[in-house]
Amino acid sequence: MYDVKSRVATEFIDDKEILDTIAYAKQNKSNRELIEQLINRAKDCKGLTHREAAVLLECDQADLNQQMFHLAKQIKQKLYGNRIVMFAPLYLSNYCVNGCTYCPYHYKNKTICRKKLTQEEIRREVIALQDMGHKRLALEAGEDPVNNPLEYILESIETIYSIQHKNGAIRRVNVNIAATTVENYKKLKDAGIGTYILFQETYHKENYEKLHPTGPKHNYAYHTEAMDRAMEAGIDDVGIGVLFGLNMYRYDFVGLLMHAEHLEAAMGVGPHTISVPRIRPADDIDAQEFKDAISDEIFEKIVAVLRIAVPYTGMIISTRESQKTRERVLNLGVSQLSGGSRTSVGGYAEEEPEEENSAQFDLNDTRTLDQIVNWLLDGGFIPSFCTACYREGRTGDRFMQLVKSGQIANCCQPNALMTLKEYLEDYASDDTRRKGERAILEELKHIGSDKVRQITINRLELMKEGKRDFRF
């Protein structure tokens, strides 16, 4: 029985409700009156239910689909402006005890080079990341209680925050590790993490168990209920996602929205971020073996309808996707982007030899961070390295209230410009610096408050003298 407020996985992600929703959406895929009503109602940026969003995803009317794409861009612009938050993943270890059939970290894989970074190696990686210009990291590690115990993750977080090389600093560490206990989530909270990220992979219980045949991750309920435990432990910001291509995309799309609705109903606040990765080739993984892979067209529509349905959330796309695809979805609602990424264990301080391949998946976008910043500026976006909300306590419900009211721009816009200025002063190529300076001058005109604009201008001048780390 479907119950959005239940803390039981199979009740807030109810199979019958998902199947009924998909059937309802298919019945109404040509219902212009209903679809137009939903599009018009979504313009107030209050979102849509999973059932309503499923109808938009299924819509077979070309002109209405174009209206959806336009609306998704409008909503993102209204709530998050033209800012794109930059981050990089840092893989600490690929030791793993799970048997996930789509991931090369699975314990049966004897061809992958197993690695685990020491604290000194982490130090070198962080210096390399700081020297690129990054301020925000997403930590990744396989699930292995012997090689990657929580104590190792906590020590690594402490090491990362302690390093300040030249003008560099990692100011927000997000963590993507396996589902764990309330007690362990409290320890992560105390370590000062930003967002706790955990992908569901697929919400289809039977397929989930087949894809995860062995190891602790096999437990569907424990995995699916992880965000409840994390939020119970005091972690304000959580990030959810599915790996599109593992299962029927309609099913996982609906499940993803039901999960977001559950978190808001049961825990008081929805997901801080939603990620939309697609399965990619990797060491001993052939992506073509997965028959539910989705086309670029479907992928783009998923991104657009997610933005319409969950307008408040940050939407993340990684270097799994090509430059062309990333460019398309940036105009459909994506608000966070990785750049200059390595998916191997380490790989920033020194390029990994080909024979030591330890990567979780192959990259599709191999450009440097500077090339991506330059490209974003060309597209009219403002690359943002801001971490101020986390550091100022604007997390959880406080953050969501600011986003939903449209007031987040009062902080985000000047903070984005100041962190971009830091990047331009310390790390950018000459061409990127010229483009960035022009963009900052133009964007200053759009700061609504005269007082905030003048403070921002004054701080930008101080940055020319070497001052750093200003924020609203």
Per-range role (PLM):
Residues 211-217, 288-292, 358:
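Short glycine-enriched, charge-decorated loop/helix-capping segments at active-site entrances
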Residues 88, 126, 154-161, 185, ...:
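Generic structural signal for well-ordered alpha-helices
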Residues 107-124, 128-230, 237-246, 268-275, ...:
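Core AdoMet radical
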Residues 80-81, 85-121:
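Canonical Radical SAM [4Fe-4S] cluster-binding loop centered on the CxxxCxxC motif
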Residues 36, 40, 44-84:
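An N-cap/entry alpha-helix motif that binds or orients negatively charged groups
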Residues 141, 195, 200, 221-285, ...:
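Conserved C-terminal portion of the radical SAM core fold
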Residues 1-37, 41, 327-335, 341-472:
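Radical SAM enzyme core and accessory elements
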